[in-house]
Design a protein with these regions (language model features):
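Thiamine diphosphate
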Residues: 1-170
Length: 171
C-alpha cells in the first residue's frame, strides 16, 4: 500500500465516524495532493474554507466544543504558523472543555520534481514538539502506518498534530 493509499484509508475510516467533520483548503475542491486522499469522505462532512488559518483553527476549536471531532487540514506546515495564537494560546492550553477534539492534519510540502520555494516546504515538527505541551505531535513517514496514527488520534483523549510529507505521496 502506498503512502497516499494509507492516508486515503485513514480519511475514509474517519469519514465513517458520526462525529467527524473535515475543515480546510482543498477539502471540497481539488487544489493539492491532500484532496485525493479525501475521496472516501462524504461531501457533507467537508467544509471548504478560504486561506484564513487563524479562522480555520478557531472554528475547529469551536466545533470541538460542540462534541465534534474536527480534522482540520492545513496543506502546508509553513502556513500553520499563521494560527499560532489559536494553537498555542487556546488549543494547547486546554482552556475549553468539551467532548470533541481537534486533529490537525498538516503537510510538509513536496520538493519533487521541483522546489516550490522556501515558504512551501518547511518542516517545523521538532519546534512544534517543543512548543506544544498538551498536543501530541506525530510524524507520519514511510515507517509509520498513517491509518494507525489517525486511529490513535481519534480514539485517545486530547488533540493531535499529525505531520505528513508531500514527497512521499507518490512513493
Amino acid at each position: 500500500m502506498t503512502y497516499a493509499d494509507e492516508l486515503t484509508e485513514a480519511m475514509t475510516w474517519l469519514g465513517e465516524k458520526g462525529d467527524t467533520i473535515f475543515l480546510g483548503q482543498s477539502v471540497a475542491y481539488p487544489g493539492n495532493a491532500v484532496y485525493k486522499t479525501l475521496s472516501g469522505v462524504p461531501m457533507e462532512k467537508r467544509v471548504e474554507l478560504p486561506v484564513a488559518e487563524e479562522l480555520q483553527l478557531g472554528a475547529s476549536i469551536g466545533l470541538a466544543l460542540t462534541g465534534k471531532t474536527v480534522i482540520s487540514i492545513f496543506p502546508r506546515m509553513d502556513f500553520l504558523m499563521c494560527c499560532m495564537n489559536q494553537l498555542v494560546n487556546h488549543l494547547d492550553k486546554g482552556l475549553y472543555t468539551g467532548t470533541g477534539k481537534v486533529i490537525i492534519r498538516v503537510c510538509v510540502g513536496s520538493t519533487k520534481p521541483m522546489h516550490p520555494g522556501l515558504q512551501h516546504c518547511g518542516d517545523y515538527t521538532e519546534a512544534f514538539k517543543k512548543l506544544l505541551k498538551n498536543i501530541c505531535v506525530l510524524k507520519i513517514d514511510l515507517e509509520n502506518r498513517a491509518s494507525i496514527f489517525y486511529q490513535v488520534a481519534y480514539k485517545n483523549p486530547g488533540s493531535y498534530l499529525l505531520v505528513e510529507y508531500g514527497d512521499l505521496y507518490n512513493d
